[in-house]
């Protein structure tokens, strides 16, 4: 499943394609959304927002399209008139004079009015977004030490969107390696230095991934500016201590870690 950085980059691409342009055609696959098609013709997308792994497409008439890609959903940007060759099932089409955005395969799609943005079950439950520039390490530390989260193992906590939105498995793995902790640790058992390091890593690593993953530094042998230190690297030596990276399963997801420096 795409994690926060990937969802945010998708939102950036959608915004760049159609933001501010009048919609010339709108189509929804689901019957409950059909009535909104005519309401959106002539309107425009004002901005595309992310809340963790959910995407909110805001329109100029105050409607908002909520979509969650889950495992299979994917957005595509095409030139208007182009019909991609794909076996995926089209769910949403938002067309302007020159660009069209298409949502395939997703099933969690709703149209929301302004008052519903605060009452929608997922949006109401989700925690602060790690890519929100206003979210600080101090706030993250407060959440880590709150009665709700302080006694939970990181294996599950770092996948819980109610704790921090936008984290997922590769970020969980990379963050815990960065701070030298395991999935079995809990916030209540950490010292001040460990808490501080974790609070910073929970924001810095997702933001670095968003800003640089997929970009290339030609002066570096490994190429990509963001690269995995342990994720999908079982059997390889840890670059920090030289021990062999291992793979196990935690909270029903693959977990990669270094037994030499994560303890």
UniProtKB/Swiss-Prot annotation:
<protein>
    <recommendedName>
        <fullName>Endonuclease 8</fullName>
        <ecNumber>3.2.2.-</ecNumber>
        <ecNumber>4.2.99.18</ecNumber>
    </recommendedName>
</protein>
<comment type="similarity">
    <text>Belongs to the FPG family.</text>
</comment>
<comment type="function">
    <text>Involved in base excision repair of DNA damaged by oxidation or by mutagenic agents. Acts as a DNA glycosylase that recognizes and removes damaged bases. Has a preference for oxidized pyrimidines, such as thymine glycol, 5,6-dihydrouracil and 5,6-dihydrothymine. Has AP (apurinic/apyrimidinic) lyase activity and introduces nicks in the DNA strand. Cleaves the DNA backbone by beta-delta elimination to generate a single-strand break at the site of the removed base with both 3'- and 5'-phosphates.</text>
</comment>
<dbReference type="InterPro" id="IPR012319">
    <property type="entry name" value="FPG_cat"/>
</dbReference>
<feature type="binding site">
    <location>
        <position position="169"/>
    </location>
    <ligand>
        <name>DNA</name>
    </ligand>
</feature>
<dbReference type="GO" id="GO:0140078">
    <property type="term" value="F:class I DNA-(apurinic or apyrimidinic site) endonuclease activity"/>
</dbReference>
<keyword id="KW-0456">Lyase</keyword>
<feature type="binding site">
    <location>
        <position position="70"/>
    </location>
    <ligand>
        <name>DNA</name>
    </ligand>
</feature>
<dbReference type="InterPro" id="IPR010663">
    <property type="entry name" value="Znf_FPG/IleRS"/>
</dbReference>
<keyword id="KW-0511">Multifunctional enzyme</keyword>
<dbReference type="Pfam" id="PF06831">
    <property type="entry name" value="H2TH"/>
</dbReference>
<dbReference type="GO" id="GO:0003684">
    <property type="term" value="F:damaged DNA binding"/>
</dbReference>
<dbReference type="InterPro" id="IPR035937">
    <property type="entry name" value="MutM-like_N-ter"/>
</dbReference>
<dbReference type="InterPro" id="IPR010979">
    <property type="entry name" value="Ribosomal_uS13-like_H2TH"/>
</dbReference>
<keyword id="KW-0326">Glycosidase</keyword>
<keyword id="KW-0234">DNA repair</keyword>
<feature type="active site" description="Proton donor; for delta-elimination activity">
    <location>
        <position position="253"/>
    </location>
</feature>
<dbReference type="InterPro" id="IPR015886">
    <property type="entry name" value="DNA_glyclase/AP_lyase_DNA-bd"/>
</dbReference>
<keyword id="KW-0238">DNA-binding</keyword>
<feature type="active site" description="Proton donor; for beta-elimination activity">
    <location>
        <position position="53"/>
    </location>
</feature>
<dbReference type="GO" id="GO:0006284">
    <property type="term" value="P:base-excision repair"/>
</dbReference>
<dbReference type="GO" id="GO:0008270">
    <property type="term" value="F:zinc ion binding"/>
</dbReference>
<feature type="zinc finger region" description="FPG-type">
    <location>
        <begin position="229"/>
        <end position="263"/>
    </location>
</feature>
<keyword id="KW-0863">Zinc-finger</keyword>
<keyword id="KW-0378">Hydrolase</keyword>
<dbReference type="InterPro" id="IPR015887">
    <property type="entry name" value="DNA_glyclase_Znf_dom_DNA_BS"/>
</dbReference>
<feature type="binding site">
    <location>
        <position position="125"/>
    </location>
    <ligand>
        <name>DNA</name>
    </ligand>
</feature>
<dbReference type="InterPro" id="IPR000214">
    <property type="entry name" value="Znf_DNA_glyclase/AP_lyase"/>
</dbReference>
<dbReference type="Pfam" id="PF06827">
    <property type="entry name" value="zf-FPG_IleRS"/>
</dbReference>
<feature type="active site" description="Proton donor">
    <location>
        <position position="3"/>
    </location>
</feature>
<keyword id="KW-0227">DNA damage</keyword>
<feature type="active site" description="Schiff-base intermediate with DNA">
    <location>
        <position position="2"/>
    </location>
</feature>
<keyword id="KW-0479">Metal-binding</keyword>
<dbReference type="InterPro" id="IPR044091">
    <property type="entry name" value="EcNei-like_N"/>
</dbReference>
<dbReference type="InterPro" id="IPR023713">
    <property type="entry name" value="Endonuclease-VIII"/>
</dbReference>
<dbReference type="GO" id="GO:0000703">
    <property type="term" value="F:oxidized pyrimidine nucleobase lesion DNA N-glycosylase activity"/>
</dbReference>
<keyword id="KW-0862">Zinc</keyword>
<dbReference type="Pfam" id="PF01149">
    <property type="entry name" value="Fapy_DNA_glyco"/>
</dbReference>
């Amino acid at each position: 499943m795409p994690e926060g950085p990937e969802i945010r980059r998708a939102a950036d691409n959608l915004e760049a394609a159609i933001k501010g342009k009048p919609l010339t055609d709108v189509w929804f696959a689901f019957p409950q959304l059909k009535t909104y098609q005519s309401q959106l013709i002539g309107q425009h997308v004002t901005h595309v927002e992310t809340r963790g792994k959910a995407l909110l497409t805001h329109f100029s008439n105050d409607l908002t399209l909520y979509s969650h890609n889950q495992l299979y959903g994917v957005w595509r940007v095409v030139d208007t008139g182009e019909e991609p060759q794909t076996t995926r099932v089209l769910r949403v089409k938002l067309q302007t004079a020159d660009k069209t955005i298409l949502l395939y395969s997703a099933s969690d799609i709703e149209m929301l009015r302004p008052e519903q943005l605060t009452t929608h079950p997922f949006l109401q439950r989700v925690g602060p977004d790690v890519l929100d520039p206003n979210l600080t390490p101090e706030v993250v530390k407060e959440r880590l030490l709150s009665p709700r989260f302080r006694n939970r193992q990181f294996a599950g906590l770092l996948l819980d969107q109610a704790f921090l939105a936008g984290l997922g498995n590769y970020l969980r793995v990379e963050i815990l390696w960065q701070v030298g902790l395991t999935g079995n640790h809990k916030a209540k058992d950490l010292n001040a230095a460990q808490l501080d390091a974790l609070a910073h890593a929970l924001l810095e690593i997702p933001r670095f991934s968003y800003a640089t993953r997929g970009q290339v530094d030609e002066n570096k042998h490994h190429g990509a500016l963001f690269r995995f230190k342990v994720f999908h690297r079982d059997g390889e030596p840890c670059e920090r201590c030289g021990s062999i990276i291992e793979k196990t399963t935690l909270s029903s997801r693959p977990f990669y870690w270094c037994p030499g420096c994560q303890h």
